[in-house]
Amino acid sequence: MVPISTRSEVQDGLIAQARSLITRIVHNSDDVYGFGTLSCTVYDTAWVALVTKHVNGIKHWLFPESFHYILASQCDDGTWCEDKTAQFDGVLNTIAGLLVLKRYRRDPLQLKVDNRDLDSRIKLATSALHSLLEEWDVSTTNNVGFEIIVPTMLDLLVQEDPSLSFELKGREALTEIREAKMNRFQPELLYQGKLMTLTHSLEALLGRIDYDNVARYTVKGSMFASPSSTAAYLMSASTWDDEAETYLRYTITASTGKGSGGVPGVFPTTYFEYTWILSTLFRAGFQSSELDSPELTAMTDTLLKAFKAFSGAIGLDSGIEPDVDDSAKIVTTLNMLGKPAHARYLCDNFEVETHFRVYPRERDPSFSANCNALAAFLHQPDVEVYSSQILKAASYLCERMWNADEKIDDKWNKSHLYSSFLYTQVMTDLMAITEAGRLDGVFTRELLTRVCVTIFQSCLRAMLKQSHDGSWNQSLEETAYAILHLTEARRLCFFEQISEPLENSIYRGITFLTTIDKPPMEYLWSDKVSYGSAYLAETYVLAARRAAESTSVTNLVGSSIWKDNASTKMHKLVGLFHRTPLLKALPKWELQASMIEASIYQGLLQDARLEVLQRPKVDGGEYLSIIPFTWTSCSNSARTNASASHLWELMALSFFTYQVDEFMEAVAGPAFKGRMTHLHAIIDEAVHCSQNRERTPGECENTNHVTSELLQAVRFILDNPTVRKASPYDRNTLLQELRIFLHAHVTQVEDNASFGRERLTGDKALTSYRSQLYRWVHTISSDHIAGPFCFYYATCLLGATLTAHPPNDCFPKSSQKYLAAATCRHLSCMCRMYNDIGSWNRDHREGNLNCLHFPEFSETTSDDAERKASLLTLAQYERKQWCNALQQLEKEMVHGASEPAAARLAKRRACLIDMFCKVTDLYGQIYVLRDVSSVIKDVVRNGE
């Protein structure tokens, strides 16, 4: 524990630093242009460098210092991209940089340039751009206006030099997005002021608009605070705009470039930075009384004046098009400052059917903007007035997080940790408000449970992704995001049992933050290209350090959904899982965390458990607790980060397979005793009816209870919304495997009955079975445990959601389909063998046919231990086979992709297939340790 005196000293130091930050902000704010600390971008600087002006009849480059900035910024490999992970930045910056080099090489005007140097640079840049465009994954790009900016920039290169025509693997996807936008574009609407957001990217409209008709939309000389858009306007309008020139000159000297020629992508950003900085500090625990100063008063007055002047609707700076992000942030910030600010404008101008939009006609909604909108509503004293808006925003956010594969993405910040901590903050606040009795009846228990699942997953996965040095991605700002994320987890009752590793994670993160003296600029924020802000980064670091110091939590959140009433049972299951070879190397707290996650899921699963098949003669087994745990533990242990929805679907599927097993043994088997051929026919009828949508329910669902139950079960699988989106091939394969799975259960009942008659002799050996062990375990036996059926259900989910052009086959090539089948079959055989080792005594007692009953074992030994050892050896053989097949499958999937998007998605599908295999493997390992099947009572097995 940190001594109280030391903690007080730390907090005093943080307060002093926060006050210093506020002072510097105000002192660097201009009365006319405002404030902005966003980093310079090569792309915008390139456009400024392209501006020419005639002075006394002579054409000059107007901003040669920007040309020199471009030269100084080029990397050794020819690109303009210091951060090699920022793929699109490299593409757009390099296109823009190359265009500048070509223009100045062709027409140096008043400058003396080294042509040999320029030629060398152009050659390097051209080669580098070929590679960048070859590797660019268009599907992952969501930068502002990229779909119209990139084609325009590539056209400008070709106009400059016809040889600069580049191949682009993602050109089809890019063209599709561009046409979707430009088909709706009408210049007249822009001239009428109805497409104001386009004034931020006027450079993309060269040749499409009359720039004289947009001149009146400048604000203090700028076009939507964009140097690149302003430069394009200045060089294209027929009348020179002195105010626009003055704006660009001021931006060069007063922005973060400080006269170097570099300019930011957006300048100024007064309201954006003021509200983000103040709201972040206050949320972390800083009090306005602690930061009270003339400078804080000045910032407050600026925001109050803006809120009143624009009726609560603001943009990133004065006069700029309002957006939901800045409008929501000013509401939250003013309320934190004790200045009441309503949120009505958010409803009137940004609310749409399912969410809150940032701007009119936006292509994709913003996750973080909806977090900020929800926060603004929750900061209202009369939250009930905004209950419908709160429900709408919360539902949208939860749905996005529930379906987010691996991580949540957002258009305004590239780090998923940013969106994750915003989500955790606002949803924890929402849970606290509902548990305090407010917003009564607004939210369903199901939605709140999903919120709890996603909050817990988000926080836990952040803990699991922490680097050994205490950082996240060796990034100061991202580490601050993560700490803000985890300090919020302190408020959640789910984290009580793992509070020690939680605090350790926070402590290690803080240690990393305090060891960095001069942090490099980080480009996590996104506009046309990525940018950063030293002031924003400093704010998040201060906020993280202050939040980490605020350890007292009075009322834990989440108790209405999660009750810690099964801790003893949980500890036993954690102990069981920790003994398995797959999980024994993990720290025990990780398994405890996976168990907590599973227990939250269990609340959802319990409601759905009996919806498919009724099984009145079955006592519930431990699988009700184990099923969710198998999926969460394997997802977390391998850091797979499967989406909450994917895990949910597979958990529900696992429940379904156990229900089928119990239904067949406890209901269908006894009902069709002596008439199993008829039961096989009913299965075919149920599958056929599910396929044939033209038949009426009355034609299919006769009075036979078993028939209607089986039909309901088949439709439960085939009518799944995601399954219905899968490719025809994947759906048909699933249908075949479902039919085989159900038939295998009937055959198993028949085999059990046949074996039951032999069992009366007291022998543990099977003498009359019609097949060898190998054939049985590779067909009926492995089909019976649902391995192939579940595998192809999972492939339907993956093909429908994670292919480049859904619905595509999960395994698009014949070699992949074959290797997938081999992986699945060998995996299922291994699991069946493990299962039979673990359930040998129960199976023999209850008359269930087991691998160990086959003559291959009885003819060599009668000792159970020796039989099990022999079967384990065979299981290990099957393990080698499926591991080898899976390895080959993964190679085929990744290397067989024809474009970057397909390769990325194939790699992700392979990762999730690997998780599926691990779960199946884990079930087998658990069976070896302990039989988890339910007890079937009062079942007669001696019929035919």
Curated annotation (Swiss-Prot):
Residue ranges of the motif DEXXE motif: 661-665
UniProt catalytic activity: 9alpha-copalyl diphosphate + H2O = aphidicolan-16beta-ol + diphosphate; (2E,6E,10E)-geranylgeranyl diphosphate = 9alpha-copalyl diphosphate
Chain positions recorded as Mg(2+) 3 binding sites: 835-836, 839, 843
Positions contributing to Mg(2+) 2 binding: 661, 665
UniProt entry tagged with the keyword Isomerase: yes
Function noted in UniProt: Aphidicolan-16-beta-ol synthase; part of the gene cluster that mediates the biosynthesis of aphidicolin, a specific inhibitor of eukaryotic DNA synthesis and DNA polymerase alpha. The geranylgeranyl pyrophosphate synthase GGS is required for supplying a sufficient amount of geranylgeranyl diphosphate (GGDP), the general precursor of diterpenes. The diterpene synthase ACS then catalyzes the conversion of geranylgeranyl diphosphate to aphidicolan-16-beta-ol via the intermediate syn-copalyldiphosphate (syn-CDP).
Protein name: Aphidicolan-16-beta-ol synthase
Protein's organism: Neocamarosporium betae (Beet black rot fungus)
